[in-house]
Amino acid sequence: MSLCLGFRELGLQPYEPVLEAMRRFTEQRSPDSQDEIWLVEHPAVFTQGQAGKAEHLLVPGDIPVVQTDRGGQVTYHGPGQLVAYLLLDVRRLGFGVRELVSRIEQTLIELLASYGVSAAAKPDAPGVYVDGAKIASLGLRIRNGRSFHGLALNVDMDLAPFRRINPCGYAGLAMTQLRDLAGPIELDEVRTRLRGQLVKHLDYAEQTTLTGGID
């Protein structure tokens, strides 16, 4: 089946309204609905996944904490981090959860390789790593064969808030970002490259930019 993947570029948006819009989209979509990926940055926020434990929030301070329904544990979102929410009919695509995670990781690995950065996945810890430091996090939820939530790639951001938590439940996990590995980076360029890699690795025939809000 020839499928077109739609992208919405949302800019900087508060986390909770986007979370509610993702849930609403997933609940209301039909078998014929186009798959969408929402590209967004968030103001500073910690999010707790379904497996999250309070002890991994070390010193949240003035950064809000939001409980969410994605997989995984606590992570941090902030400006300069590229977040992609994958609103896909994975049943229609024919992917299992493990294959979807693997395809997302390979998307990120090839994207980073295009900047000369050698990255890898870990079989026991979803995400993408460079020399043991985490550069991208994954957290998904599948409901009725449809995915939501997605990935977060550290591009050009303040990494200090990660020290207030045990990222993804791992004490002392080092975090890194593309700017520190490849020099000054334009987020818009990374966004464009990410779109192309997602289309390739998720087996879509083409992509389009969607307009309008997510309300």
Swiss-Prot record:
Its EC number is 2.3.1.181. It catalyses: octanoyl-[ACP] + L-lysyl-[protein] = N(6)-octanoyl-L-lysyl-[protein] + holo-[ACP] + H(+). GO terms for biological process: protein modification process. Keywords: Acyltransferase, Cytoplasm, Transferase. InterPro entries: aa-tRNA-synth_II/BPL/LPL, BPL_LPL_catalytic, Octanoyltransferase, Octanoyltransferase_CS. The active site is at 168 (acyl-thioester intermediate). Belongs to the LipB family. PANTHER family: LIPOYLTRANSFERASE 2, MITOCHONDRIAL-RELATED, OCTANOYLTRANSFERASE. This is Octanoyltransferase. The lineage of its organism: Bacteria, Pseudomonadati, Pseudomonadota, Gammaproteobacteria, Pseudomonadales.
